[in-house]
């Protein structure tokens, strides 16, 4: 049934954590026997209070690398740089290659025009918008790092959306925050589906099996 598949999906997220964290703990232990001391790579990620904090607890070595070599060089929370726009072009090009169509470029162009219009109307929002773009770029490139496929682009994109939505959510009233929390839960379930799926269309089928 759909409920059983949903429970299995939550169980899979625990399995991934147990496997990944366990293997890294074994590597850390073996390294200590040889006189090397490696930093901790997981810090109870499922206790994280928000998506941003989750990525400070999960696969810490990768998260730190993405922060130091992608997010901060792009400008981080200080604004956009030339690297920000290079990343957008690169991600768009990868999307075009994967889809074999220019519709991705068209969608990105429309979004860019909308963002430019919003910045023109409200220049005081420029810094926040650029910071969120840097976050999205970082998570999308982090997804592509796992594999150049739609699965991982969606996985990275949903992670980025979760981080951006939380910034909006944390300052809102309790009813709106509850609604956004439900959306984040749905996004989390989608993340758990698309990560292990061997192909994008199979991930879509899995969603149908659970929710339809």
Predicted regions located by residue number:
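Membrane-embedded transmembrane alpha-helical bundles that form the catalytic cores
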Residues: 1-212
């Amino acid at each position: 049934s759909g409920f059983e598949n949903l429970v299995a999906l939550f169980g899979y997220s625990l399995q991934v954590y147990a496997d990944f964290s366990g293997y890294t703990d074994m590597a850390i232990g073996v390294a200590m026997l040889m006189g090397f001391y490696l930093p901790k790579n997981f810090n109870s990620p499922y206790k994280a209070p928000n998506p941003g904090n989750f990525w400070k607890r999960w696969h810490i070595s990768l998260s730190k690398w993405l922060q130091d070599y992608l997010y901060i060089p792009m400008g981080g929370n200080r604004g956009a740089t030339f690297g920000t726009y290079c990343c957008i072009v690169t991600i768009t090009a990868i999307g075009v290659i994967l889809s074999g169509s220019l519709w991705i470029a068209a969608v990105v162009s429309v979004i860019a025009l909308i963002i430019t219009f919003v910045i023109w109307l409200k220049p005081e929002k420029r810094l926040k918008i650029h910071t969120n773009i840097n976050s999205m770029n970082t998570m999308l490139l982090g997804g592509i790092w796992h594999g150049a496929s739609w699965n991982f682009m969606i996985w990275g994109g949903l992670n980025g959306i979760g981080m951006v939505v939380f910034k909006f959510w944390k300052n809102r009233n309790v009813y709106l925050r509850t609604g956004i929390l439900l959306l984040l839960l749905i996004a989390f379930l989608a993340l758990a589906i698309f990560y292990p799926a061997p192909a994008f269309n199979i991930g879509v089928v899995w969603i149908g099996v659970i929710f339809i």
